């Protein structure tokens, strides 16, 4: 499962770096977070990031992620996520940086869902073996 506190730390560390409040450089940040895909997404297309209010975009994107991160996802949930991310993308005029953040966050949700399905399958198999 995705370590939620790690994702929060990545967001906080990136924001500190972006706002110039951190003495940590990009390379140190990458090493600290083992080049995590979420951090790499935040660091990509920074020219595009400069075109939007980064703190607000990050807050709005992260709120979508937080809303769904602990759910056992149903089809309706996935449809809702797609709709919410579409609206955010539209709001920020399809900004490439914003879209990349949304894609990475959805990827994290997909990882969690795949892990939940794998665990459920293993439990089901163990139950069958016990019969």
Task: Walk through the language-model features, giving the residues of each.
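Repeat-associated, polar segments at repeat-unit boundaries in modular proteins
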Residues: 33-54, 100-117
């Amino acid at each position: 499962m995705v370590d939620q506190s790690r994702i929060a730390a990545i967001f906080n560390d990136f924001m500190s770096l972006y706002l110039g409040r951190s003495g940590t450089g990009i390379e140190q940040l990458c090493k600290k977070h083992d080049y995590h895909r979420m951090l790499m997404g935040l660091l990509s297309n920074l020219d595009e990031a400069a075109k939007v209010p980064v703190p607000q975009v990050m807050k709005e994107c992260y709120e979508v992620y937080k809303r769904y991160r602990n759910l056992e996802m149903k089809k309706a949930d996935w449809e809702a996520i797609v709709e919410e991310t579409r609206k955010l993308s539209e709001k920020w005029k399809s900004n490439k940086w914003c879209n990349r953040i949304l894609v990475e966050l959805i990827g994290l949700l997909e990882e969690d869902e795949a892990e939940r399905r794998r665990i459920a399958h293993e439990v089901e198999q163990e139950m069958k073996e016990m019969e």
